[in-house]
């Protein structure tokens, strides 16, 4: 092999290795920053179509209804713990260490984003509350359309009381 061909071959191999390394790093970064949406039932039993269950330590988003009577606040800090459920019977615990949204209340639909700290326990970094009767994030609407019935709120809940 003459030196010119050898140089071209070396350059081509180096280019292929470099592009492969960049593609691998890009896919790894995208995979680690991916927030998958789950319902409480899917966290417990896995997704219906694939059976995929989130792993402890994985960043996820969870949507469901706050279980009435489940909210426990720590009087010494901002720490709050509550359960969310769906109509299929799945229920998980969500812990949160910040201020809850003004529209957050029991019986309300929410989306919580965070890390699964134990099976069935989400350490939330963000909690979003549904802000009116009609709006809902698309993935929550899809999941709730399959597994939730419209709830009737009593007057105390409509006025923002717990």
Curated annotation (Swiss-Prot):
The chain crosses the membrane at residues 9-29. Gene3D superfamilies: Nucleic acid-binding proteins. The gene is ccmE. It is found in: Cell inner membrane. It comes from the Bacteria. It comes from Shewanella halifaxensis (strain HAW-EB4). This is Cytochrome c-type biogenesis protein CcmE. InterPro entries: CcmE (IPR004329), CcmE-like_sf (IPR036127), NA-bd_OB-fold (IPR012340). Keywords: Cell inner membrane, Cell membrane, Cytochrome c-type biogenesis, Heme, Iron, Membrane, Metal-binding, Signal-anchor, Transmembrane, Transmembrane helix. Pfam families: CcmE. Residues 30-162 are periplasmic.
């Amino acid at each position: 092999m003459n030196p010119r061909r050898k140089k071209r071959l070396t350059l081509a191999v180096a280019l292929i290795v470099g592009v492969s390394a960049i593609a691998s790093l890009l896919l790894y970064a995208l995979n680690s920053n991916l927030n998958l949406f789950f319902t409480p039932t899917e966290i417990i039993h896995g997704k219906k179509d694939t059976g995929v269950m989130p792993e402890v330590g994985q960043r996820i988003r969870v949507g469901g209804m706050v279980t009435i009577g489940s909210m426990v606040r720590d009087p010494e800090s901002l720490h709050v713990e509550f359960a969310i459920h769906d109509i299929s019977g799945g229920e998980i615990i969500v812990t949160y260490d910040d201020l809850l949204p003004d529209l957050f209340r029991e019986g309300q639909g929410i989306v919580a984003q965070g890390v699964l700290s134990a099976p069935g326990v989400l350490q939330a970094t963000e909690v979003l509350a549904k802000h009116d009767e009609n709006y809902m994030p698309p993935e929550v609407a899809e999941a709730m359309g399959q597994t939730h019935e419209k709830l009737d709120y009593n007057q105390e809940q409509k006025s923002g009381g717990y």
